Structure formats: structure tokens, C-alpha cells
């Protein structure tokens, strides 16, 4: 046995090819040591909501039951169950034994056909080849960003807006540029400011309608103006429409793709919100590209990217046809009636509180409330305001700093009515205790 003694600092690397020995080169030896570090991607991943909420140092008032108006999960309180047809569809899929194996990463052809059929319309035709099934709408958004943007390029994101856009983009080395929504115009986009952000590295405009966190619903005319900017600047749109059709009776949801054939659009949706099953993780991407601007490259790219996790849950895919076709319209109506009633109740109660400026929502599951900070000088910002609200009243609302929009807070309107009433009463008590008249406005306070 050959005695190597101590290994040299470099090793000759030999390979035998067809009986001939050749030297490929010198390779430095690796010094064996433990050096396990997190990846750059993990270090760049940042969730504003978690960063703020997890660092809250206050505890709820032990004498008051906690009321969480912060969680965007409609199932939390048990008052908004999905329809029996939806659960029966899942039971049938499970009992059939047909949906237990691997499937194409973009989903069963039959399931994609059902989604295409459900959303097809003359203004925005769809076929199965235009549908990618995903593990929830969040993965749909991730795939869209991954296929459209390279590190160093930028995307346009609403402010206030869903924090996941930033979390996903920055983890991939994509720059986020924030365009403003205008509270005085029911959260319409500041189109002039939006267009000023576009440069040679801009590869995607995210439009979230109906909006989380605002609860706003864009009019047809405003959507057409957004599309005009995208067409003029040749920027594709990622339409986050997970709350599509979840609008109140005085508004109408217009799918963005129905209003333009010029702009290529990737529309993201899913079962989570409208069907009240966020834990089932079923989402989709609808590819609208009637001028073939995306071509095969973007479609192929989405397929390749979807192969990283081999598709969403097969059981839910097996249930999709029944879920989409059999869910009765009364289920959707009842859900929206409840949400509108809660929205009206919450808005009315908070609008009567000095120092607060709620903005009435038109859909989704949220409303935003402005804080007139000059009347609450004890608090530096919305984070301190909401922290103290938890400490004194055991009511938890998300500070809108989580959505890049300070001095507002978001209220979730899915809680049972009795809890909403109690929460609003506690918020009123809190504000009355901390409200101070601004200088020169004593007359207003005496009213």
C-alpha cells in the first residue's frame, strides 16, 4: 500500500480516455472544514409584515379578549366556510383514487381546460395552453416574476401594496420601484408618477385589482388608462386578480385582459379568496397574448420554472371541474353581502372617530384607515399607534408601514359582526384617550 504521507498542496488530475492517460491540469486541494452559510438569496429575502409584527414588543391587555383584524385568512374565525359543493368535490376526488400520482408540472390537461373554460370570454379568449396551474396565487406571482425579470432589472409595484411582491423580487435580485396609489381618489394610480419610473430596465408592471390592502376596485376607464401607459411604454403587465369578482354591489370587476389586445398580460388568480380555501394552495396563471409578444419563449419559460416543484396538489386539480361548475351563485352572493355589511359597519364606526380617516372599500376583504398623527402626538408613527392599540385594547391591526404606506392601518373585514362591533368600540375608546387637538383647532375640538 502506497504511503502518501502528507498530501501536496495541489494534485495532478488524470483521466483515462480510450486507454490513454492524460493530465487535465492542476486542482487546488480543498481544506476540509465546516463552513455552512446561508445563500445570498435567503439573505436578500425580506418580508416587511413579519419584520414588523415579529418585532412588536407589546403584549395584549390580559383583561380583554384579543381581536385580530390583521389576518387576511377568511377561514380563521369559522364564520365564512366554503360551500358544501366545494368540500364534496374534494371528497369525490379523494374517493376516486384517480389523483394520487405525479402529473405534468403545469397541471392536468383536463384541469387546465376547466380553468380556461371558466375564464374564457370573447374579449379575452383562453385555451388550456394558456393556463399554468400553480401552488397558490403566490407561486403564480413568483413564476411570473421569475420568467420576466433578471437580476438588476426592475418591476413596478403599487404603494400601498401586497408585501409579497417586494419579498419575491428582492430575493431574486430584482429592483422594486414603487408607484403611488392616491387615497383621495379611492386609491387610483398616480399615472404620471407611474410612467416617470419606467426606464430601459423596466420589465413588468404589477396591477393588483381588487386591491390588498386597500379594498379598492378600479373603474373601466382607469384600467384603460393604465393599459395605455403599458402599451405606450411596451411594458407587460402582471395582473394580480386573486380577488377578482369579489366586489360589492355598487362596483364592477373588469378583468384587465378583456380591455386590451395590445398589451401582453399574465393574470394570476386562484381558489383561495373567492372560494374561501386558502390552505388548498390552488392558483393559476392565465396567459393573454393575442399579438404573440410573449411568443413561445415566455410560455416555455413558465413551463420550465413550474418544473421546480412539479405542480400543485393533484387532489385539488381533480376537484377543480366540480368546484368551478357546481358552486352555486348564492354562495358568492352571501359572502359578498357579509363583507359589504361588515365594511359599511366598520367604515361608519371609524369615520365617526376624531383623528381617523377610513376610506370606504369597494371589494376584497380590507379597508385602510388614515391616522391624523398630529392629533396623536404620543406616537411617532403608525407602528407605535397599532402597538399601543394592542397593549391597551387587545385589537390588532396591521400598520400600513407593512405596505410601504406609513400613518395608515389596515382592517380585515372577515371577522364576525359582533367582533367587528366590539373592535370598533375599543378603537374609539383608544382614540378618545389619546386624541389631542392640534394647535389653533380648539374650536373644532369643542364641537
UniProtKB/Swiss-Prot annotation:
SUPFAM superfamilies the record matches: PLP-dependent transferases
Enzyme class, first EC level, given as a word: transferase
Catalysed reactions listed for this entry: L-tyrosine + 2-oxoglutarate = 3-(4-hydroxyphenyl)pyruvate + L-glutamate
Gene3D superfamilies (UniProt xref): Aspartate Aminotransferase, domain 1, Type I PLP-dependent aspartate aminotransferase-like (Major domain)
N6-(pyridoxal phosphate)lysine modification, residue list: 273
Molecular function per GO: amino acid binding; L-tyrosine-2-oxoglutarate transaminase activity; pyridoxal phosphate binding
Pathway recorded for this protein: Amino-acid degradation; L-phenylalanine degradation; acetoacetate and fumarate from L-phenylalanine: step 2/6
Modified residues (Phosphoserine): 441
PROSITE patterns reported for this sequence: AA_TRANSFER_CLASS_1 (PS00105)
Cofactor dependence: pyridoxal 5'-phosphate
Keywords per UniProt: Aminotransferase, Phenylalanine catabolism, Phosphoprotein, Pyridoxal phosphate, Transferase, Tyrosine catabolism
EC number: 2.6.1.5
Gene Ontology CC: mitochondrion
CDD domains, sorted: AAT_like
GO BP terms in the entry: amino acid metabolic process; biosynthetic process; glutamate metabolic process; L-phenylalanine catabolic process; tyrosine catabolic process
Function of the protein: Transaminase involved in tyrosine breakdown. Converts tyrosine to p-hydroxyphenylpyruvate. Can catalyze the reverse reaction, using glutamic acid, with 2-oxoglutarate as cosubstrate (in vitro). Has much lower affinity and transaminase activity for phenylalanine.
Subunit (UniProt): Homodimer.
Family that this chain belongs to: Belongs to the class-I pyridoxal-phosphate-dependent aminotransferase family.
Protein name (record): Tyrosine aminotransferase
Taxonomic placement: Eukaryota, Metazoa, Chordata, Craniata, Vertebrata
Gene: TAT
